[in-house]
Amino acid sequence: MTPFRRSLLVVATVLMAVASVHAAEFRFDSGTITLPDGFSVEVAAGPPLVERPVTIDFDERGRLYVTESSGTNIPVAEQVKNPTHRVFRLVDSDGDGTFDRRTVYAEGLMMPEGSLWYRGSLYVTAPPEIWKFTDADDDGVAESREVWFDAKTLTGCANDLHGPYLGRDGRIYWCKGAFAEQTYDLPGRPGWTTRASHIFRARDDSSDIEPVLTGGMDNPVDVVFTPEGERIMSCTFLVHPGGGERDGLIHAIYGGVYGKDHGVLD
């Protein structure tokens, strides 16, 4: 099953397969969550283990990899000179459903915008790069750190990259936001440049990069896959704002062009 990345305020534990229409409220310091009757929410990790979690993913042994913001809000042009964001590996040592041990798996990252555990490595998107971290001796600290993909752009809002996501076809997918110009070496088309938004995919060795979708939307944010392998993408500014419309979901058919008219599509 492809893991979904989500903010780690809480992790929901499903207690019943079928829920009734009744609702239950669970109150936490961060707010109140309302769920259908028969579902429960428990805090799986909180301070001091994690303070500002951004994304999570599990490995095959149930250990949790949490990307965390350092809390800085200085401009990205300054952040990139001394990146301060981190990745933690959390372990539930006694099996009670609450994580109780932490190691700093990786540090010195730009703002994390996605994470994916795949075949023994953790892929983390931190514009302008997607990193591949590997902990060969399993001590909870990644000793191997390599740039899996380098977009070579970093805009003020850092929408240059989102992802990565594992497709049903075994490829690794990621999103490019508009409107920075990036250059890709595509099979048979080296030096291909684009300012448009895209979904891209590649093999896990980063070879055979190809665009899956092209668009005039501002910021493709997330991609999920149906059991049949169909791609569903969420994005901001799918259409020009007006009449209560702006963001949207797209059934991302291979080779499709979507979103509002924009000069980046010319």
Residue ranges and their predicted role:
Residues 1-4:
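N-terminal secretory signal peptides that target proteins for export/translocation
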Residues 24-266:
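Beta-propeller blade termini and top-face loops
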